[in-house]
Curated annotation (Swiss-Prot):
Keyword Hydrolase found: yes
Gene Ontology MF: a single term: magnesium ion binding
Pathway: Amino-acid biosynthesis; L-methionine biosynthesis via salvage pathway; L-methionine from S-methyl-5-thio-alpha-D-ribose 1-phosphate: step 3/6; Amino-acid biosynthesis; L-methionine biosynthesis via salvage pathway; L-methionine from S-methyl-5-thio-alpha-D-ribose 1-phosphate: step 4/6
Superkingdom assignment: Bacteria
Requisite cofactors: Mg(2+)
Protein name: Enolase-phosphatase E1
Species classification: Bacteria, Pseudomonadati, Pseudomonadota, Gammaproteobacteria, Lysobacterales
Gene behind the chain: mtnC
Function comment: Bifunctional enzyme that catalyzes the enolization of 2,3-diketo-5-methylthiopentyl-1-phosphate (DK-MTP-1-P) into the intermediate 2-hydroxy-3-keto-5-methylthiopentenyl-1-phosphate (HK-MTPenyl-1-P), which is then dephosphorylated to form the acireductone 1,2-dihydroxy-3-keto-5-methylthiopentene (DHK-MTPene).
EC nos: 3.1.3.77
Source species of the chain: Xanthomonas campestris pv. campestris (strain B100)
Keywords: Amino-acid biosynthesis, Hydrolase, Magnesium, Metal-binding, Methionine biosynthesis
Length: 232
């Protein structure tokens, strides 16, 4: 098999630890959400996303109710585009004040840099908003890696467990789906990408999944425990 013409990667559980997102980013956004909405709720960009939350609830509600709803969605790990956008805005403050830096596995950072040097275009597809993705890579504990990525995709392109989303990405980057390798730790996402025609590899990191996924669960996806084990 020839080397892929492009590599598309997830973030959480793939390039980076699940615990960083769950234990650092989510709690930070939850704590900061009330003050952020009260202070910036009048800004058009922030209000746009708050209105989407209100539409989801189906009521004309005060901001205090929206704040409670957003905090509940964080607790539930809801993949709502408005929540992800607002979280990204809050995290931007955290990155810029150096409250934290984004975790990137060393093997992922090294391999992403190597692929970029070899001329393989790299793309990111995550449930986090595109601005949040860019901040994540720009403020990683391996340095600014944002320049390695050719383009970014979030749930505005479609849900990650639907094959149509991966077809749209292939169309947008102008690479045939069979020439794209998608990396993720979520089997349902890999299944969707494979249905769209992409090559797939499951990141089954022991740090995130102490019990390896079974062969039946992995199916036809390549299974690796780090980027260094990937066969292109």
């Amino acid at each position: 098999m020839t080397r892929p013409q492009a590599i598309l990667t997830d973030i959480e559980g793939t390039t980076s630890s699940i615990s960083f997102v769950k234990d650092v980013l989510f709690p930070y956004a939850r704590r900061a959400m009330p003050a952020y909405v009260r202070e910036h709720g009048g800004h058009p960009q922030v209000r746009h996303w708050l209105n989407q939350v209100a539409d989801e609830i189906g009521e004309d509600v005060p901001d205090e109710v929206l704040i409670t709803t957003l905090q509940t969605w964080i607790d539930e790990d809801r993949k709502h585009t408005a929540l992800k956008a607002l979280q990204g805005m809050i995290w931007e403050d955290g990155y810029r004040t150096a409250d934290f830096s984004a975790h990137i596995y060393a093997d992922a950072a090294i391999q992403l840099q190597a692929w970029h040097a070899e001329g393989i275009p790299l793309y990111v597809y995550s449930s986090g908003s595109v601005p949040a993705q860019k901040l994540f890579f720009a403020h990683s504990d391996a340095g600014d890696l944002s320049g390695l990525v050719s383009d970014w995709f979030d749930t505005e392109v479609g849900p990650k467990r639907e094959s149509s989303s991966y077809r749209r990405i292939a169309e947008r980057i102008g690479v045939p789906a069979p020439e794209i390798l998608f990396l993720s730790d979520v089997i349902e996402e890999l299944d969707a990408a494979k249905r769209a025609g992409m090559r797939t590899a499951l990141l089954d990191r022991l740090e995130d999944y102490p019990t390896p996924r079974s062969a039946d669960d992995v199916g036809s996806h390549q299974r690796v425990e780090s980027f260094t084990q990937l066969v292109l």
